[in-house]
Amino acid sequence: MDLGCTGSKFYETPNIDRLAQDGVQFTQAYSSCTVCSPSRAALLTGKYPARLHLTDWIPGYGAPDNAKLKIPDWQKFISSDTTTLPQQFKSAGYSTAIIGKWHLSPDAKQSDNYSPQKYGFDINIGGNHLGQPGSFFSPYKIPNLKDGPTNEFLTDRESNEAVKFIEQNQTKPFFLYLAHYAVHQPIAGKAEVITKFEEKNNRNGQKYNATYAALISSVDDSVGKIRETLKRLKLSDNTIIVFTSDNGGLPKVTDNAPYRDGKGSAYEGGVRVPFIIYWPKANSNQSTQSTPIQSIDIYPSLIEMTGITSQSSTIDGVSLAPLLKSTKALPTRDLFWHYPHYHRVGGARPYSAILSGDYRLIHFYEDNRDELYNLAKDPSESQDLSNSEIEIKNTLKKKLDAWLKSTSAQLPLN
């Protein structure tokens, strides 16, 4: 994992680690998909990607030549009849802003039709159809983000824009979606920070990616800058902070151990993510939570924590507020994933999955095959139990099939 608070001895994230100490860190947190666009849509709507029919990164790779199945005709935007989190807050009188990555528009030609402004954001700085920047150094080659001085670093620029927004709205409620393009490709970092980590590698005889470490450091610096701004403006005691990621780490760039594989895969390494919530009203006696949660839970949690009235009828996530405030256990539930696509980098082939208690079942559509793992005993998913735990496998498969039907999930085609 890439953070000090998740066990890294190489990456340096003192500000994120401090946020984890001051807030609540969830040690079994999941994104709603193994790739970015669906996870972001799920976070902003509280709905599973399967229900949204937005199930791959935009525009997606398509099926490879050796594909056995056809990809369904999936949707590359959030439907206009879906109420988003920024729309909820805007209706409640909040100023709303997105700074950074949007990646929920079909393409450049339709970017304006599906821009963040159409979904409740008053201010949009840098959000468009792109999933990654042209460069992390100015000129950025990002539509609707004015270039800064030559070689200005993108994460720093996004952080400075966030500080400006907070300062401008310090006397009224605000909702800020700071979606850094980091740590996405193209992996880049400031030269002096890269050198620092190269020297650290040399001292310790390690071979970590120093450039990636520098990029992570830029995000950590951003967290520190945001928290310092809130403290300076005396807003810390009245502000909720959520820190998470949209998918697991990129294979070959980072190490998701002990979890198997990474972004774009069917396994834990593709969907296990850091997740920290800072809420001044949370129970101060807890700093970690082992309850399994998913990014769809952010939507109902923020609605309840802020006390605004929800305008959305169907929400798949559950509020974490009771758990955070009193350590009251959440209702028992299963978590689900659906990816009817092919991913060139992570290796995923069309699959659906369910987490039920300690067990995770993955159904692969190409050969109608199931894999079953006990994550409590085997977090690295190295021992498939599908042939030995038949009853559990069948029970989970029935639950998965029922969920797919209830969400009208689009299945891969023969």
Residue locations for each model-derived region?
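Active-site-proximal N-terminal segment of extracellular/periplasmic enzymes that hydrolyze or transfer
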Residues: M1-V24, Q383-E391
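Formylglycine-dependent
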Residues: L54-S95, W102-L176, H180-E192, E198-N204, ...
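A short aromatic-rich beta-strand->coil structural motif
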Residues: M1, F89, K101, A162, ...
